[in-house]
Amino acid sequence: MIEVVLQVLSISAITTTIALFFCGIPICMQIRRQGAVGDISGVPFLMGVLGGSFWLRYGLLKMDYTMIIVNVVGVFCMAVYCIFFLIYSLPKKTFTCQLILVTSTITGMVVWIAFKPNLDYLGIICMTFNIMNFGAPLAGLGVVLRNREVSTLPLPMCVANFLVSSQWCLYGNLVQDIYIIIPNGIGMFLAIVQLSLFIVLPRRENEKSPLEQLANWFTGRDRNKKEKDLETGECAEPSSPQKIPSDVHEKLEKLMAAEASSESRRCSADFMDHPPSYKSRSSSVPDIFSVQS
């Protein structure tokens, strides 16, 4: 039974971890669109190559095929991201020096393990790299707590980190590997803290958190407030005159124009049928144009 659970968990951990490695593709697409790396840091890619290489050597030394498959794919993806980052980085000197340092560290580790294979020493180093990677989002948590909102936290990434960390923590318990349990347990704890912030804090400023909305729904505070506002007249809006629809307005204008035209024709007909009579009256003014004979 344990073997079946371990196989299912291995397949699930491989799938979710490889899917998490593909999160670098949107970053590379953004770099390509803007034509340069800009403010994007290449350190996560370098740390991915470094940590993946150490974990790959750890898996080879332990002959753990689940770790071997995951870290082969991980090192390949992170190496491709590093090459892509190097192409678009200006100037290239800084990132090239960092890449040489990482490559030298990996080479030294491979030579050291070849002459002195020690699983415990390598496990401690791998565990340290994992804890450093999981501790990187702590700066983002500081920003969230300072702003009292979670708009800067990516929810899909937090959920993915929780799934991957919890699966590897359970996998470490099944294979009884403390070097897998400790870093992934810390990562799972940090992921739970991040996910809890989505419940406690609002998504954006001037919004209510889901926890506050749920509390108001249970206590009926919002309903009581609305009823109180209705009683005091705060929610009553002043009545505004109804706006006549445009089609009705046009029909009224046409009807008024037709009535005005009909009234004008009726007045003209009355004038023609009954013209006004003018009474002639003698003028007392002498006719200055008549010639007396």
Curated annotation (Swiss-Prot):
Residues 225-246, 259-293 are annotated as: Disordered. Mediates both low-affinity uptake and efflux of sugar across the membrane. GO terms for cellular component: Golgi apparatus; Golgi membrane; membrane; plasma membrane. This is Sugar transporter SWEET1. One of its GO terms (molecular function) is sugar transmembrane transporter activity. Its main location: Golgi. Residues 279-293 have a biased composition (Polar residues). The keyword Signal does not apply. Keywords: Cell membrane, Golgi apparatus, Membrane, Repeat, Sugar transport, Transmembrane, Transmembrane helix, Transport. It is found in: Golgi apparatus membrane; Cell membrane. Disulfide bonds: none annotated. One of its GO terms (biological process) is carbohydrate transport. Residues 259-273 have a biased composition (Basic and acidic residues). It holds the Pfam family MtN3_slv. Coiled coil: none annotated.
